[in-house]
Amino acid sequence: MAKIKKKGTSGQAKNYITRTQAVRKLQISLPDFRRLCIFKGIYPREPRNKKKASKTSTPNTTFYYTKDIQYLLHEPLLRKFRDQKAVAKKIARSLGRGEVGDASRLEKNHAPKLTLDHIIKERYPTFIDALRDLDDALSLLFLFANLPSTSHVPPKTIALCQRLCHEFQHYLITTNSLRKSFLSIKGIYYQATIQGQDIMWLVPYRFVQRVNGDVDYRIMATFVEFYTTLLGFVNFRLYSSIGLRYPPKFDTRSDENGAELAAFTLEGRAVANAAKTIEGSNKQSNNSSNQEVSRDVQAKVDKVIKTAGLDKTKDEQTVEATDENTDAIDRFEPAAPEADTLPQPDISGEEAGALFAPFTFYISREAPKAPLEFILRAFGCKRIGWDAVMGDGAFTHNEADTRITHQIVDRPSLPEGALPAVPAAKEGAVPAVRPGTRIPGRTYIQPQWVWDCINEGKLLRPDLYAPGETLPPHLSPWVKPSKGAYDPRATLAEQEEEGEAEMAGEEEEEESDEEMEEAPETKKADAKADESESEDEDESVDGGMDVADSDDDESESGQEEEDFGGFDDNEAASESEDEEEAARTQHQKELEAEAAGLPFSSNGATDDAKKKKSSQAKKIAAKKRKEEEELERQKMMMSRKKRKLLEKMMYSNKKQSEEAAKLRSKRRKLEKTGEK
């Protein structure tokens, strides 16, 4: 006879473990368990049947995989957590005895320090894996870099996040890896391509942040601790891959003066030093009798110099640089018009890096300096100036500098009388320029021009982005308009369906005619309302008493009712009178035109145009009806499954086309009102 299977030894009860059981098994506190799970990348799981997975009667429990908890038993951080707990007990005991010096000594010398290097290597075996997981890390670190320091967020954490973020930005500037950016309500989105991996992160706007108590900063601080270690590894690898020293030199004084990116100085690993060491070994080998070794060393020296490009003159290097810049990306065009359109490659890093290279920009005080400086430098601009109030590191602080070609302004254009006076300049300071003045030979643009240019990959017309102009729509570069969807960048003629403009024109004419007809009716209704009010006043004056003339009025109304014989005769008479009146007025206009010697243009032309429009609309409606009938016949030949799928597709396409038609009609009305 087979043994009775014991409950809870197989299936979901064995595969899952509750959080309380996991904490007891690891013998650590709940906050340490949360930190350990965040560091190791272990998250709660949801079993298919909680009753089978749980051994208790409490339904609201958090489950983990048993294998994950078993994996945590061998983690070296567990010993660190236990050591921290032991040191905390000793510190509490010393404070209880009043031995403050011993407590500070224990905290300073004996507190164990956590290192997450081995966890980074475990979770990301290759560098590509680390790059793929860099989106959330950058978003969180840029968020903490813009937060104010509080009791939950210490200043050291903010300074560390700022330093790592600026180092990463310097790598993007050096390699021209930034591709796209988008201004949204949440913040500024950036996308960079590093070693074939697209990385996107969000940077908040620099507003005054109010820290709420709803956020659990202990959990976020754990993520920040892990992500700072990750970004430090990534920055070291990225800097080493392009031959730069890490970490770069950091000037504390210029950073305190608001230099930000300019506070860092990048240094390359000098190849000449390696060449000198090899040359020194070459001399020693010449003194010896072994000439083969000297040849090998000389070959190594030649190889290093050749790879570094030290054997070429400056002219050759400039010629090669110009040749590389002139190389364009191949475009793949379809051979036949019916063939599929091939996806075209994006702009290369060299073309993107030279977009703003020949220009000198000046950022006004009202424009956001930090994102503009980063984007302009990432796309090749080497000369960026701003006011001295905005910090150090500018190419020039003089707004009247003649070398400036573009000035980024975010103020509305004011009339000459409304401009403020020229501020008084201090001794030895840069002469101030009156706000709102235009310097000849300089292009004034709004900040959106920079973002739209990098998203389009080319320089756009600056007159569309001049101060005071209505800006074009700023669209997301990652959302491409699909077929049938509304595209605000295209004209109405390119998006309208066949006969849509004619139908819209007819509807507007009908609405205008109805408004014209409603106008006299409203006047008549107002007149009737006034008459009824006057009658009510008369009745109120009578006081409800019968007047002698009331019987006569009733008899007259009775006679009128008896004489009334229907509407047919009256309507026919009125129609004939209207026709006679219209013919008479038309004949009178013809006589007046003949007397004046002018050609007479009657309403016949407009009637013909209306008839043509109505005939076109009827043709389009008949064509659509025919297409719908043909589609219905084709649907009858389909199976039920395919027919249902087709109906779902048609329903979604119909909804999309209706939304696009609404947006087009709204745009059509706005354009007409703008023309008026």
Swiss-Prot record:
GO terms for biological process: maturation of 5.8S rRNA from tricistronic rRNA transcript (SSU-rRNA, 5.8S rRNA, LSU-rRNA); maturation of LSU-rRNA from tricistronic rRNA transcript (SSU-rRNA, 5.8S rRNA, LSU-rRNA). Residues 277-296, 471-676 are annotated as: Disordered. Its main location: nucleus. The lineage of its organism: Eukaryota, Fungi, Dikarya, Ascomycota, Pezizomycotina. This is Pescadillo homolog. Residues 281-291 have a biased composition (Low complexity). Residues 520-531, 582-592, 625-635 have a biased composition (Basic and acidic residues). Residues 494-519, 532-541, 548-581 have a biased composition (Acidic residues). It comes from Aspergillus terreus (strain NIH 2624 / FGSC A1156). Gene3D superfamilies: BRCT domain (3.40.50.10190). The gene is nop7.
